[in-house]
């Protein structure tokens, strides 16, 4: 959530931020208008309360002077003031709720070094690692290779659950499981993360705290009877773990990693990536979350991104890192790096991880603070990233490690997890 006090003091920061995101600034006009009305009512209530206090003193004086008639009149006047205060406070509360709802729909302020641009076509490439493989045969897409191995089944996935669901069998099912274990092992043993097992159903509050609601409600799977949500990412429970808590600066940064299934309706993606496993309603992901201090959060974003990159390096999969421009930046993010893996079926790089610094946007919503060395309370900063999206990593391995005979070579680091060096029809 935005800092309303900062908006009131420096509205130009928010006008500029909204323009950079290519959004209409009308919402800023509206919240400032509501805030002005609210402050006027607050001032009016304070004025009336002061007046009522004066009447209380006059009542006490009249009683001392045994002027009961005067005291009765003053008490009546005081009651009228009290009733007026009550009416105004009800209006005040409504305006406060309206202001809160408006604030929940204002995105985070882009960091100063975020490149300006209208959409993903203006994202800036930062670096590349590895070279795309040059095949001496015509490579196949995973949506052909998997079924030919009888290990990837889109038809039965659709029969069970509809479009954008996949069934994996045998060694591809094992590969999915191996990747999860491998990623968690690297992040916990090499990168110092604490592994967490989180619920995959969360309350509405948890979605609100992390900025998934109200903005993205139509993209979420909701259990209406219980008002619970299937998580779109483990970022939601990992950040919300510390909601309404006061942490100690000496315990920061907190670094969590968690595997979970993720559930997304993909409401706005009709016609995109309709073939294969790239865009699914249910997919596995290993998530990385940091709770850190404002002073080091952008440095920590670099570290988190490198942790995600390390998985691709160990798997020897070529990738690139891009910095998202202001027009492509996510709602909660102040700065984001996308990591994109090379996929032969697309003859291009496709997103496999998104690493973001949300600054104090999520921590204000969830009221995550820490006591600093100055003994004052400060809002922490929250970072998140995929480390990695498991299904897309599996797809990248299937396509980049394929052989002419239709078999798939298992990356060296995964052989101990898989128990085989090659996936093939037997």
Curated annotation (Swiss-Prot):
Gene Ontology biological-process annotations: selenocysteine biosynthetic process; seryl-tRNA aminoacylation
Reaction equation(s) it catalyzes: tRNA(Ser) + L-serine + ATP = L-seryl-tRNA(Ser) + AMP + diphosphate + H(+); tRNA(Sec) + L-serine + ATP = L-seryl-tRNA(Sec) + AMP + diphosphate + H(+)
GO molecular function: ATP binding; serine-tRNA ligase activity
Chief localisation class: cytoplasm
Name of a matching Pfam family: Seryl_tRNA_N
Enzyme Commission numbers on file: 6.1.1.11
Residues at which ATP binds: 264-266, 351-354
Keyword Aminoacyl-tRNA synthetase annotated: yes
UniProt binding sites for L-serine: 233-235, 287, 386
Pathway: Aminoacyl-tRNA biosynthesis; selenocysteinyl-tRNA(Sec) biosynthesis; L-seryl-tRNA(Sec) from L-serine and tRNA(Sec): step 1/1
Listed GO CC annotations: cytoplasm
HAMAP family for this protein: Ser_tRNA_synth_type1
Subunit structure as annotated in this protein's UniProt entry: Homodimer. The tRNA molecule binds across the dimer.
Domain text: Consists of two distinct domains, a catalytic core and a N-terminal extension that is involved in tRNA binding.
The family this protein is said to belong to: Belongs to the class-II aminoacyl-tRNA synthetase family. Type-1 seryl-tRNA synthetase subfamily.
Function summary: Catalyzes the attachment of serine to tRNA(Ser). Is also able to aminoacylate tRNA(Sec) with serine, to form the misacylated tRNA L-seryl-tRNA(Sec), which will be further converted into selenocysteinyl-tRNA(Sec).
Name used for this protein in its record: Serine--tRNA ligase
Source organism of the structure: Thermosipho africanus (strain TCF52B)
Name of the gene this protein is made from: serS
